[in-house]
Amino acid sequence: MVGGVAASSDDNAIGYIELLWVDETFRRQGLGRVLLATVEQNLQAAGCKRVRLETFDYQAPAFYRENGYHEFAKLNYDYAGVIEYFFIKTLSLPIGYDIPPDFSIEVAEDLAMEAIENKLHAYNVKMKPLLQEKMGVTFTFLAEENGQCIGGIFGYSTMYKIGYIESLWVAETNRHAGVGTALVDALLNALKDFGCPIVHLDTMSYQGAAFYKALGFEQFGQLTYPEIDAAEVFFVKHLVSVGERTINANK
């Protein structure tokens, strides 16, 4: 096993590249391009019209640009010395590829993908040591009323103490009553206490875009999907002032 790729698609048929790794010994032989084309072909067959991803500056922004991806946003984590690029590609043409001689592409089992994840993690740590002990540290909060769950939020800190809000839900009967705000505040306080100087998220235009703007989040990117008459909006919020970031991130 000298490389691997993993991807997923959401309810709106938007593909997402979770990871791509090729053993350093076998790079620049076309394997990365073939793995990428293979997963793009599968996403297209599943009905995806677009695929997006994020990559750090020390990883593969040049590779993705060479393969038709377009940068639509980026975040500069100055305290960690890394930049995260956000890319998108339209899957509009038949996707073909030629497998290099002596190599084969197979569907991966869970154990194989776990090994790929470990290889990618080792490479990342070698290139840029983490600012936290674990790759990801999760935070979950629930809101209850009379013993019943009426809302919840899930987020995490990843790699370089980069905060991310994964999901937020409040029961319809309890919305516009401050429950969502309280849940977001609880998560932001936990991330700040952990040492995260920044938090970001993405939400659909019909979900929480106006809500996050009202809470002081700043928009740094947007993708429009005409086929579903909606947009995916990307928000960021700084949890500490610029002068505090390096200190907090290295707690």
Question: Predicted regions span which residues?
Answer:
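Acetyl-CoA-dependent GNAT
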Residues: M1-I14, E18-L19, D23, Y58, ...
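Ordered, small/hydrophobic-rich secondary-structure cores
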Residues: V5-V51, Q59
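Helix-adjacent hinge/juxtasegments
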Residues: D23-R33, F56, I165-T181
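Conserved acetyl-CoA-binding loop-helix of GNAT-fold acetyltransferases
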Residues: R28-Q41, E66, H176-N189, A214
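Short glycine/proline-centered loop/turn elements that form peptide/ligand docking sites
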Residues: G32, L36, D57-A60, Y77-I83, ...
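Conserved GNAT acetyl-CoA-binding A-motif
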Residues: L43-D57, L191-S205
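Conserved catalytic-core motifs of GNAT/GCN5-like acyltransferases
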Residues: R52-E54, R65, H70-F86, H200-D202, ...
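Conserved N-terminal entry element of GNAT/NAT acetyltransferase domains
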Residues: K89-D110, H238-K251
